[in-house]
């Protein structure tokens, strides 16, 4: 599926403001970007899993054991962040399928190509995101 999308999009294609916003080619471009990102995360996670399985369970030296446990904790937190990112990628792919990708979930306005290229899982315009973060900060400070 990814190879078919790559062929239809083209190797050097980058979405442009000169095109119709979220036309079929742009949607395919972002679908390709998201699928490649998801694959790279899966590949990295497999390496992490292998490291955890290969790592010594019982280090004879207490310092070595503490170091291994710290490394494991970091690996597991990284995997948790990756799991959450994959959920965001899957959500973005569903929005593409539903015809909602590229539009702010709060205002319905276009998110913008530059923002989506930088952060393909973005669900809000910069302005809506900033307002959301301000509200979160205020509620945390209370």
Regions found by a protein language model. Give the residues of each.
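Short Cys/His-rich "knuckle" micro-motifs
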Residues: 114-118
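Short functional micro-motifs and their immediate structural scaffolds
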Residues: 111-112, 133
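Interaction interfaces in information-processing and related assembly proteins
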Residues: 1-98, 135-136, 141-142
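Residues immediately within or flanking Cys/His clusters that coordinate Zn2+
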Residues: 101, 122
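Cys/His-coordinated zinc-binding microdomains
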Residues: 34, 108, 129
């Amino acid at each position: 599926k990814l190879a078919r999308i790559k062929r239809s999009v083209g190797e050097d294609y980058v979405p442009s403001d000169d095109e119709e916003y979220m036309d079929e080619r742009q949607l395919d471009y972002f679908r390709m970007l998201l699928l490649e990102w998801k694959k790279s995360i899966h590949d990295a996670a497999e390496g992490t899993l292998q490291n955890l399985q290969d790592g010594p369970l019982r280090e004879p030296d207490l310092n070595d054991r503490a170091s291994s446990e710290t490394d494991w904790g970091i690996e597991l937190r990284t995997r948790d962040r990756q799991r959450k990112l994959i959920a965001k990628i899957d959500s973005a792919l569903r929005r593409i399928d539903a015809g909602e990708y590229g539009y702010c979930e709060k205002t319905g306005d276009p998110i913008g190509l530059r923002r989506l290229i930088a952060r393909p899982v973005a669900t809000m315009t910069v302005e809506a995101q900033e307002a959301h973060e301000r509200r979160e900060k205020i509620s945390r400070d209370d």
